[in-house]
Amino acid sequence: MHDIEYIRKNPEGFEKAMKSRGIRESTAEEILEIDHEKRSLTTKLQDLNRQRNEITEEIKKLKMSKSPCEEQIELSKSITNEIEAISLKEQAEKDKLVNVLSNLPNIPAQDVPIGADENSNLEVRRYGGKRQFDFVPESHYELGEKLGLMDFEQAARISGSRFTILKGQLAKLGRALINCMLEMHVNEFGYTEVYHPALVKNEAMYNVGQLPKFSDDSYLTTDELRLIPTSEVFLTNLVADKIMEEKELPIRFTAYSECFRKEAGSAGRDTRGMIRQHQFGKVELVSITTEDQSNDELERMTSVAEEILKKLELPYRVMLLCSGDMGFAAQRTYDIEVWLPGQNKYREISSCSNCGAFQARRMNTKYSSETDKKMKKYIHTLNGSALAIGRTIIAIMENYQNSDGSIAIPNVLQKYMSNDTVISK
């Protein structure tokens, strides 16, 4: 949600920011028109309430003196009716303003590159050299099917398209990755692990910016609960509608969950393999912090995600996303892209974002300053995947494949896999 005071003072800057996010309509003008009408109605209501209070006092005095007061009573009734009518109009304008603001993305941070799509993203750094194969590397789905450990046909028969069955050692590899990642986040980086439901109320989805704009992208149950598209939804809402103390911050959560997405806008993209699925596992990081520390927290969070890839010895690059490629709630985002030799390209495996106060305004979460307890500021929220389990499995399969179709197991994972060193038939 946006700060209406900022829009009042900086309409041109807000308009420019929205255009950089791909919003072409004249948003600031529309917002200020609605805001003006709402404030005008609020002023009228305040004036009418003042008049009614004065008349009420006058009626009391007249009754005490046993003087006639019928005229004043009728006037009070008339004002009450007018207040009720204007209150309905004021609420309608408030709802209209919230609806417009709720559908607009966050304002990009000043150092975010301006651009329409991924072609304007900036590479920040790279890690690791690409492996030189003495054979033509295969894709993960070719490897998985030949090993008999990845079944797309049965998944499609039972569940439909964009689902995958992992068996045997590949299923075990997924479990090993979950355990490795969570232990690292908790033991090395001080995150608090959370196990949570996969279903949430619409309010929780609204608070993080998933609703109303992306309603069609999530799965809705018959009793109005939604399957989470990411643990970010639940973890961020753990602090919804609270006033915290600055000394409590930062708070850092981590969780593994199954995630569910319709992928409504992905028709024809990544139809083979398990790059883009309706259901996938992911380990998520969420940080709750202050305005002054949120930029540093984003750097820390990104480095945590990178550390996993370093321990897995997978080559990757870090990209600073441009304004048009960031997620709806983000003001600054790093994507980490892992090298996939089977595709001969880098693909996203993690996305770490600073959402600033955008989500906090929606869920009404603030903190009191240590120097001034009366001063309340909105918290800043951050989220990042560390990492997507399916895509990490893909990266291991393609980077650690052998000429005979077997897959070496990264050293850091072997203790989670009964000390196995290779995945084979």
Curated annotation (Swiss-Prot):
Species: Wolbachia pipientis wMel
Residues bound to ATP are R261, K262, E263, E348, I349, S350, S351
Give its localization: Cytoplasm
What function does this protein fulfil? Catalyzes the attachment of serine to tRNA(Ser). Is also able to aminoacylate tRNA(Sec) with serine, to form the misacylated tRNA L-seryl-tRNA(Sec), which will be further converted into selenocysteinyl-tRNA(Sec).
Q: Which CDD domains match?
A: SerRS_core
For this chain, one GO molecular function annotation is: ATP binding
Where is it found, in Gene Ontology cellular component terms? cytoplasm
Checking SUPFAM superfamilies in the record gives: Class II aaRS and biotin synthetases, tRNA-binding arm
Quaternary arrangement and interactors, per the entry?
Homodimer. The tRNA molecule binds across the dimer.
Q: Sorted alphabetically, which Pfam families does this protein's record hold?
A: Seryl_tRNA_N, tRNA-synt_2b
PANTHER family noted in UniProt: SERINE--TRNA LIGASE, SERYL-TRNA SYNTHETASE
Q: What is known of its domains?
A: Consists of two distinct domains, a catalytic core and a N-terminal extension that is involved in tRNA binding.
The alphabetized UniProt keywords are: Aminoacyl-tRNA synthetase, ATP-binding, Cytoplasm, Ligase, Nucleotide-binding, Protein biosynthesis
Instruction: List the protein's name.
Output: Serine--tRNA ligase
Q: Which GO terms describe its biological process?
A: selenocysteine biosynthetic process; seryl-tRNA aminoacylation
Q: In which pathway does it act?
A: Aminoacyl-tRNA biosynthesis; selenocysteinyl-tRNA(Sec) biosynthesis; L-seryl-tRNA(Sec) from L-serine and tRNA(Sec): step 1/1
- Under Enzyme Commission nomenclature, its number is 6.1.1.11
EC top class, in one word?
A: ligase
The residues the record assigns to binding L-serine are: T230, S231, E232, E284, S385
Protein family membership? Belongs to the class-II aminoacyl-tRNA synthetase family. Type-1 seryl-tRNA synthetase subfamily.
Q: Which gene encodes it?
A: serS
Q: Does the keyword Nucleotide-binding apply?
A: yes
Catalytic activity entry: tRNA(Ser) + L-serine + ATP = L-seryl-tRNA(Ser) + AMP + diphosphate + H(+); tRNA(Sec) + L-serine + ATP = L-seryl-tRNA(Sec) + AMP + diphosphate + H(+)
